Regions:
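C-terminal catalytic "cap/lid" subdomain
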Residues: 2-276
Length: 276
């Protein structure tokens, strides 16, 4: 028999409550989480927009990242690009579920990350897999100024079955990671100057106007083409730390540098995070 008189009970405000009742959990969970890496700058590099363009787009950006290392500690995340779209096409033709397509696309983003890490290897930059970023990022960034990883979130077989194409892709993954770590900021590097009123490469491109500043709430109502994942817009509304994201043109030398120095050189998107 177990002597139950010796069992210690831990007083916990959540122990006897349902975690589904917001009114009960808010007094405990409503506080602002700590910032684990408040000095970190997260940079997401587009797969289709940058990496697929080859050396003419990649090498100047690598030089810019190299020059930024003395100023910032960076987590550089890469998207998948056109190869993921081909994988989607083949997978859909074979009838694969969305949860099987997600890790296949993520592997393509990882390949782009390895390419970028190889080019920055002389500066001590290496590629880290998801578990290492989750558990050992701080110690790696104490040894070097930057690391590279895949921007795809590791939903994989847990991907939401709301669409035949994975909805949580590279932009979404970069934001989730930056917000969870309490990073100083997130900059998304694309091949356009920011978010436009209409697709600048579409039939009505001549009428497209650059939105210098907007909000996730406004973009949620936006019906046009976005250079970002739609799921990212939804997640921005519930952000805890990242108050704004800047989308910049990585094909223009110096834009990324200016953005990381706090300059307004693209589209700034305000999230739902409250100022500290």
């Amino acid at each position: 028999m177990v002597d139950t008189a010796q069992i210690k009970h831990v007083a916990s405000p959540l122990a006897r409550q349902t975690l589904l009742d917001g009114e009960l959990t808010h007094p405990v969970a409503g506080g602002r989480p700590i910032r684990m890496l408040p000095w970190l700058q997260v940079v997401k590099i587009g797969g289709r927009s940058i990496m697929d363009r080859g050396r003419d787009a990649i090498l100047p950006l690598v030089d810019e990242l190299r020059n930024l290392l003395p100023e910032h500690r960076l987590l550089i995340l890469t998207g998948a690009g056109i190869r993921a779209r081909h994988v989607y096409s083949v997978g859909l033709d074979l009838g694969l579920p969305v949860g099987s397509l997600a890790p296949l696309a993520a592997s393509e983003a990882g390949q782009n990350g390895h390419i970028l890490a190889f080019l920055l290897a002389p500066e001590g930059v290496s590629y880290l897999e998801h578990p290492t970023i989750a558990n050992q990022l701080a110690i790696h960034l104490s040894a070097t100024r930057a690391v590279v990883g895949s921007a795809f979130p590791p939903y994989h077989h847990h991907e939401f079955p709301t669409s035949r194409i994975p909805t949580h892709r590279a932009d979404t993954g970069a934001f989730l990671l930056a917000d969870a770590l309490g990073a100083a900021g997130l900059t998304i590097v694309e091949d356009v100057d920011g978010v436009y009123s209409t697709d600048p490469n579409g039939s009505g491109g001549k009428q497209a106007q650059l939105l210098r500043e907007t909000s996730a709430a406004d973009l949620a109502k936006f019906k046009g083409t976005l250079p970002l994942d739609r799921a990212l817009v939804e997640i921005m509304l519930t952000a805890r730390h990242i108050e704004r994201v800047q989308v910049v043109n990585g094909l223009v030398p110096g834009r990324l540098t200016a953005a990381l120095r706090g300059e307004h050189v693209g589209t700034i998107i305000r999230t739902g995070a409250r100022p500290a």
